[in-house]
């Protein structure tokens, strides 16, 4: 598998992969979500250094005068203002350092909490066809009750054709107040026709953890991202699998782009009794160290499935378990995002996400732009019978540990 396939890159950086009523423009990775009291603050001398803001203001006034005098179309002053701020941050050349408008920041907060008001689906947009497809339907959602299915292709929202629209605009059309409904028309390949559904908007918890028992005492647990509800869902899953007699755990982190640091630290801690989980270091050599406590949630053998789209927080979990020999890593080399972002509210409803530090695995290794190599390398192959060859290899590795 290509380590950074086009679909994944678009999902991580521009929000091609998004959940309805969450931030379509949110960039993933690993980050601290700070409270509104923790606003961005820089020393005065740093604010003034390097840039002549008087000259910049003068230049902007000239540009604005020229636009007002000559530009053919109407000007959205708010969009122009936001564009200035976004361009300023984008000039850093770091795709993970981002300015959020008030609306984007509100959506980001909903996204990172894992709870929001919406129809309860995750969608993706094909950049070549512009078609938007449902890829997940969350449990207990209005979408599930209405009968929306993964694989459905979205064509209309409230009788309005959306096949030429950007995914962000479509998300905005589907969003609404709790208890209200939206009419969605989808094409369903299995039935070869269009289906119209009235879907209620509800308070929804995103399903970031899925699990089931496999044969031979193997429990399967997939984490799709790390947000505010992930650890509680992970605990529920692990408890249920153990109650069913799980002897070995197959942990699937494939295509997991990352998320919140606090959540992945909690999960990693459940597999370790001591030692460093991850450490960080900023440009001044300062940082934090996160360590495991003595409590152990599962002491059986573990296989971890990863691929080139397993990034950031996923790599913290896989890296720690690998460094301590706590699990066998199976699959392909991970994405290689070894940096941490802080999100700073700016006091006016907007916010900025800034890359602030590198992170290191327990052995002191930086995996940034390198990734984590698996213990057992297995490229994904397309089997005619639909067999997941990577999953089968991980099961084989786990059975060897259990024997």
Give the residues covered by each predicted segment:
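Intrinsically disordered, Ser/Thr/Pro/Gly-rich linkers and terminal tails that flank
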Residues: 1-125, 149, 156-157, 162, ...
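Cleft-lining beta-strand/loop regions that shape enzyme active-site pockets
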Residues: 2-4, 135, 144-149, 158, ...
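Short, structured beta-strand/loop micro-motifs enriched in basic residues and often containing a Trp
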Residues: 132-138
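Conserved P-loop NTPase
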Residues: 341-345, 352-384
């Amino acid at each position: 598998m290509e380590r950074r396939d086009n679909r994944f890159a678009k999902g991580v950086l521009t929000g091609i992969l998004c959940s309805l009523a969450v931030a379509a423009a949110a960039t993933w990775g690993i980050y601290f979500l700070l409270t509104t009291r923790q606003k961005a603050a820089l020393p005065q001398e740093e604010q003034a250094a390097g840039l002549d803001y008087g000259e910049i203001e003068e230049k902007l006034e000239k540009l604005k005068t020229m636009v007002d005098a000559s530009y053919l179309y109407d000007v959205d002053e708010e969009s122009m203002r936001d564009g200035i701020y976004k361009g300023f941050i984008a000039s850093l050349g770091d795709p993970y350092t981002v300015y959020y408008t008030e609306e984007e920041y509100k959506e980001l907060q909903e996204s990172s909490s894992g709870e929001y008001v919406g129809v309860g689906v995750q969608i993706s947009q094909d950049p070549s066809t512009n078609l938007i497809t449902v890829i997940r339907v969350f449990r207990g959602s209005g979408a599930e009750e209405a009968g929306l299915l993964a694989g459905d292709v979205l064509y209309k929202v409230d009788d309005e054709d959306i096949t030429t629209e950007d995914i962000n605009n479509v998300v905005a059309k589907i969003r609404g107040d709790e208890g209200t409904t939206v009419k969605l028309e989808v094409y369903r390949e299995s039935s070869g026709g269009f289906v119209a559904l009235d879907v209620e908007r509800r308070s929804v918890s995103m399903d970031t953890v899925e699990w089931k028992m496999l044969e031979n005492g193997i429990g399967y647990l997939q984490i799709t991202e790390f947000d505010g509800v992930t650890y509680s869902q992970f605990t529920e899953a692990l408890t249920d699998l153990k109650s069913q007699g799980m002897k070995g755990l197959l942990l699937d982190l494939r295509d997991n782009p990352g998320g919140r640091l606090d959540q992945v630290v909690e999960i990693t801690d459940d597999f370790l009794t001591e030692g460093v989980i991850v450490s960080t270091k900023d440009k001044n050599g300062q940082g934090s160290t996160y360590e495991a406590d003595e409590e152990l949630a599962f002491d059986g053998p573990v296989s971890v499935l990863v691929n080139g789209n397993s990034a950031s927080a996923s790599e913290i979990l896989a890296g720690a378990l690998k460094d301590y020999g706590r699990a066998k890593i199976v699959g392909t080399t991970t994405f290689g995002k070894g940096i941490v972002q802080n999100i700073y509210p700016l006091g006016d409803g907007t916010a900025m996400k800034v890359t602030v530090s590198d992170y290191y695995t327990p052995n002191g290794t930086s995996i940034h732009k390198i990734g984590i190599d698996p213990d057992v390398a297995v490229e994904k192959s397309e089997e005619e019978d639909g067999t997941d060859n990577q999953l089968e290899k991980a099961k084989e590795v786990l059975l060897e540990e259990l024997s």
